[in-house]
Amino acid sequence: MARGATYKVQFKRRREGKTNYNKRYKLVDLDKTRMVVRITSNHTITQLVKIGENGDETLVSATSKNLKEFGWLGNGKNTSAAYLTGYLFGKKALNEGYDETILDIGVQPSIKGTKIYAVLKGALDAGLYIPHNDSILPEDSRIRGEHIAQYAESMDDDEKNAKFANYIRCGLSPEEIPDHFESVKNKIDEATQ
């Protein structure tokens, strides 16, 4: 391991896999605000971050936990919740006077159509300008949860009750997810005008 004078120990955050300093240096060098998106096992976190002398400064923040305030009955880890979190974030950022930013996904892999890009699409639909390529964004039907509704319709009741027990326990039928998504999006629009 650390034997000899030629061994160089990496920075702690690099060893832990939390920070890629090459990417971070390029983002810091741009001197623009960054939309930082982090996906945890249960929630989506989105922050508008500015570089400061004493470290990064968070200007605007939204998490999927905030969606409960607007009546979201689903969990915070699906694509619909990621989109709504990005949409809420975009509305908050515009209200604070920020209309342009760049995306910072950290060490997460960049895969087309994932929750990271659902957050990006939500922020874009809210009115933020973020440089991107349209081919990476997920489809609208997937964001609205139509694939879940179609899958639930093809199941019998016992199988549906077992598979979607958490949704049913919260009072949301899986077939109603697209309509519920639209109602929560409208509530976000009303609250952030």
Curated annotation (Swiss-Prot):
Keywords: Ribonucleoprotein, Ribosomal protein, RNA-binding, rRNA-binding
Keyword Membrane: no
InterPro entries named among the record's database cross-references: Rbsml_uL18_euk
MF GO annotations: 5S rRNA binding; structural constituent of ribosome
Coiled-coil annotated residue ranges, if any: none
GO biological process, one term: translation
Domain of life: Archaea
Pfam families named among the record's database cross-references: Ribosomal_L5e
A GO cellular-component term linked to this record: cytosolic large ribosomal subunit
Disulfide bonds: none
Signal sequence segment: none
Family (UniProt): Belongs to the universal ribosomal protein uL18 family.
PANTHER family recorded: LARGE RIBOSOMAL SUBUNIT PROTEIN UL18, RIBOSOMAL PROTEIN L5-RELATED
Self-association state and partner proteins as the record states: Part of the 50S ribosomal subunit. Contacts the 5S and 23S rRNAs.
NCBIfam families noted in UniProt: PRK08569.1 (NF006342)
Role according to the record: This is one of the proteins that bind and probably mediate the attachment of the 5S RNA into the large ribosomal subunit, where it forms part of the central protuberance.
Name by which UniProt lists this protein: Large ribosomal subunit protein uL18
